[in-house]
Structures are given as structure tokens and as C-alpha cells.
């Protein structure tokens, strides 16, 4: 686009430096009209580049009092009227040129707004909805994290309960093992007693065999003694039958030995059976305890695996939460950066709009003053009071347009190549 903001501002500045109206060359003074020289450019800016309002040179100078206005139209009054007509034509041409420049500038401003400025006010409701959605997602993640923490606490409590049960069962297992060791000692004692009883039975059998042998030897000795004796027949009471007596004694000893042996066997069998039953019961209990210990060990391993899985899931959720927080923080920083940039652009657009409004007001003021000057010349042509004209022209001549200068400073804070914050400072000073 051919329109340049700098050139436009520079032209307006140059146009606003001088007075509103400059009666070039000469001024109307009270009582005299001095010689009019060549007039330089009255307005060189505001779109009227190269436009000059020239005034014809007067051939003669006037003197005397112009309060009555009689000499203005007499003698050399025709030259003055011709000069005023030329100046009026130049002013009218200047007015038309300024109107055309104003129209052109308005078209350029409108075109610039259409190309640079947004056609409508930006609607940030979509960003608000996105921010609300992100906040809801963060809240959901926090709720899920709290639920995971609660599940982890429950798992820890369950693991603690199982640990207590495991300690209790381990104490019971230790007690059962101690009982088994005690029963093993009892079993060993019974085995020793059995061995002692077997040894005693063998010794008794040996004693019985020895007694039988000694008895047989004694019987043989007695028989030999009886065989060597002389038979003497006397009338006496019949003697004792030693053989029968020995047989009876032998039978009684055999019955007694058989009875003792039978009782020892029965007692040994009873004790062995009782011990065998106890060993069987203890073995079954030991197998049951071993099964329970195996199940508890398996349960403990499963709980340990579950605890490790929960811990890994917790770590994963914490990492995901940190990633989500970092991502949302970066997105929020990007949104804030974009909002700051948009606010800076909006402030820039507002300042440009205000500056262009001021420039437009300056142009309107120039146009108004030109219209006032045209009206003044019209009244001069119609023969109005010259004193009033002189006073108005002097007032317009002495009135200057204030020139102001705006200094705009943009301060941006950059972190890791990203704009974190942006601040626009604007200072207005008069020149």
C-alpha cells in the first residue's frame, strides 16, 4: 500500500509547525496597507505536498487610514481587488486540494484498517471454554490421583494386615516346629526304650536258656547220682519225685517267662501304636502347616507383586500428572503470551487510532480556519469593516497550532526465546 504512516505523520507535523494562517510578505496594519511581497507556501503538508498559495506582487504601496475602506476600491483599488481575487482563487484551490487530500487520506485510513485492523472484535470465549476444559481435566486428574493414592493406602493397609497374619502364622509355624522337635525327641526316646526292651527280652531269653541248661545239667547230675546208689528196700514213706518237681518248676518258669514276654510284647506294641498314631497325627498336621505356609508364601508373593504394580502405577500416574501440569503450564504461558501480544496490538491500534483522530482533527481545524479566511475575504469583497478583518486576520495569524510528539516504548521480557510479558509505555510531550 502506498500509504505510509511515517510520511503521513511527518507531513502533518510539518503542516502543524507554522501558524494557522500566514499573510505572506506583508501584514495588514492599522491605518496602512504595506507593500505585498511574494508569499511562500502556507501549508506544505497534510497531503498537499508541493501546493503553494502565491500572492501577486503589488506594484504600488498604500498609505493612509483604511478604516473607512474608501481607498480600497478607488485608484489602485482595482489592483488590490485583483490581488484579493487571485488569493481567493488560490485559497479555493487549496481548499479543494485539502478536501481531495482528506478524502484520499480517509480512503487510505479505511483501507489500512481493513487490511491491518481486525474487522470485528476478537471473541475470546473459545479460549475461555478451552481454559475451562483444561481446568476440568486438571481437576479430573487430581481426583484420579487422589483415588490412586487412596487405593495405594488401602493396598498398604491390606499388605500390613497380611503381614500381621503372616507374622502370626509364622509364629504358629515356629510353635508347631517346636512341637515337632519335641515329638521327635519323644519318638527318639520311645525308640531307645524299644531298643532297651528288645535288649532286655534278649537277655531274658538268654537267662531262660541258661536256666534251662543249668536245670538240665542238674537233672543229669541227679540222675547220675541216683543211678550209682544201691537200692535199699526199707519200709519208709515214699520219697519225692524230683523229676516231677523239676518239671513243675520248669513249667512254672516257662509260663512265667512266657507271660512276661507276652506282657512286654503287648506293652511295646501299645506304646509303639500310640507313638505311631502321634507321629501320624503330627505328620498330617505338619503337612497341613506346610500347605498353609506355602499358601501364605504364595499370597505374600502375590501381594508383593501387586504392591510393586501399584507403586509403579503410582509413579506412572505421578509422571503423567507432572507431564500434564508441564504441558498445561506451557499452553497457559503460550495463551498468556498470545493475550499479551494481542493486548499490545490492541493498545497499538488504539494509539494509532487516537493519533489518526488527532491528525484528522488537525485537518478539520485547518479546513475550518481556511473556511474562516475565505469568509473573511468574502466579507472584504462585500465591503465589510476592514478593522474587523484586520483584527480577525491578526488573531488567526498569531494563533499557532500546538505540535505534540508521542514516544511509545515496548518492553518485552524474553525467557528461553519466548516472550513472557510485554508492556507498552506511551509518553506525550509538546514540541
UniProtKB/Swiss-Prot annotation:
Pfam families in the cross-refs: Filament
Record-marked site positions (Cleavage): 235-236
Region (Head): 1-76
Biological process (GO), any one: regulation of protein secretion
Occurrences of domain IF rod (ranges): 77-388
Region (Coil 1A): 77-112
Tissues of expression: Expressed at low levels in the more differentiated suprabasal regions of the small intestine, and at higher levels in the colon, mainly in the upper region and in scattered cells throughout the remaining epithelium. Also expressed in epithelial cells of bladder, ileum and stomach and at lower levels in pancreas and earskin. The phosphorylated form is nearly exclusively expressed in goblet cells of the small intestine and in the lumen-proximal cells of the colon (at protein level). Also expressed in jejunum and duodenum.
Record note on modification: Hyperphosphorylation at Ser-13 occurs during the early stages of apoptosis but becomes less prominent during the later stages. Phosphorylation at Ser-13 also increases in response to stress brought on by cell injury.
Residue list for modification Phosphoserine: 13, 16, 26
SMART domains (alphabetical): Filament (SM01391)
Assembly description: Heterotetramer of two type I and two type II keratins. Associates with KRT8.
Comment field (misc): There are two types of cytoskeletal and microfibrillar keratin: I (acidic; 40-55 kDa) and II (neutral to basic; 56-70 kDa).
UniProt-recorded name of the protein: Keratin, type I cytoskeletal 20
Amino acid at each position: 500500500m502506498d500509504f505510509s504512516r511515517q510520511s503521513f505523520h511527518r507531513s502533518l507535523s510539518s503542516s502543524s509547525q507554522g501558524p494557522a494562517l500566514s499573510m505572506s510578505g506583508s501584514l495588514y496594519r492599522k491605518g496602512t496597507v504595506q507593500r505585498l511581497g511574494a508569499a511562500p507556501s502556507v501549508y506544505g503538508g497534510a497531503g498537499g505536498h508541493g501546493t503553494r498559495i502565491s500572492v501577486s506582487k503589488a506594484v504600488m504601496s498604500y498609505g493612509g487610514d483604511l478604516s473607512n475602506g474608501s481607498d480600497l476600491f478607488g485608484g489602485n483599488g482595482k489592483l488590490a481587488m485583483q490581488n484579493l481575487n487571485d488569493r481567493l482563487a488560490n485559497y479555493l484551490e487549496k481548499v479543494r486540494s485539502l478536501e481531495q487530500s482528506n478524502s484520499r487520506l480517509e480512503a487510505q485510513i479505511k483501507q489500512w484498517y481493513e487490511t491491518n485492523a481486525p474487522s470485528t472484535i476478537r471473541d475470546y470465549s473459545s479460549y475461555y471454554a478451552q481454559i475451562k476444559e483444561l481446568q476440568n481435566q486438571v481437576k479430573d486428574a487430581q481426583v484420579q490421583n487422589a483415588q490412586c493414592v487412596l487405593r495405594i493406602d488401602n493396598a498398604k493397609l491390606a499388605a500390613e494386615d497380611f503381614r500381621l497374619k503372616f507374622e502370626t502364622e509364622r509364629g504358629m509355624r515356629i510353635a508347631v516346629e517346636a512341637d515337632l522337635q519335641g515329638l521327635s525327641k519323644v519318638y527318639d526316646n520311645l525308640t531307645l526304650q524299644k531298643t532297651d526292651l528288645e535288649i532286655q527280652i534278649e537277655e531274658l531269653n538268654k537267662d531262660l536258656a541258661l536256666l534251662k541248661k543249668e536245670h538240665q545239667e542238674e537233672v543229669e547230675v541227679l540222675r547220675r547220682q541216683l543211678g550209682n546208689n544201691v537200692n535199699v528196700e526199707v519200709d519208709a514213706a515214699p520219697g519225692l519225685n524230683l523229676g516231677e518237681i523239676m518239671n513243675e518248676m520248669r513249667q512254672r518258669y516257662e509260663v512265667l517267662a512266657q507271660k512276661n514276654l507276652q506282657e512286654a510284647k503287648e506293652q511295646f506294641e501299645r506304646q509303639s501304636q500310640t507313638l505311631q498314631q502321634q507321629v501320624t497325627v503330627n505328620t498330617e498336621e505338619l503337612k497341613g502347616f506346610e500347605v498353609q505356609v506355602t499358601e501364605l508364601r504364595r499370597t505374600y508373593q502375590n501381594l508383593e507383586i501387586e504392591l510393586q504394580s501399584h507403586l509403579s502405577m503410582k509413579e506412572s500416574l505421578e509422571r503423567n500428572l507432572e507431564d500434564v501440569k508441564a504441558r498445561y503450564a506451557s499452553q497457559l504461558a503460550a495463551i498468556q503470551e498470545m493475550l499479551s501480544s494481542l493486548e499490545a496490538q490492541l493498545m497499538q491500534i488504539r494509539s494509532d487510532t487516537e493519533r489518526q483522530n488527532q491528525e484528522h482533527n488537525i485537518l478539520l481545524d485547518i479546513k475550518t480556519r481556511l473556511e474562516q479566511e475565505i469568509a473573511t475575504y468574502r466579507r472584504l469583497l462585500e465591503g465589510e469593516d476592514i478593522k474587523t478583518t484586520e483584527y480577525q486576520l491578526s488573531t488567526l495569524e498569531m494563533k499557532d497550532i500546538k505540535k505534540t510528539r508521542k514516544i511509545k516504548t515496548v518492553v518485552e521480557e524474553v525467557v528461553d526465546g519466548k516472550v513472557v510479558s510485554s508492556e507498552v509505555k506511551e509518553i506525550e510531550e509538546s514540541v
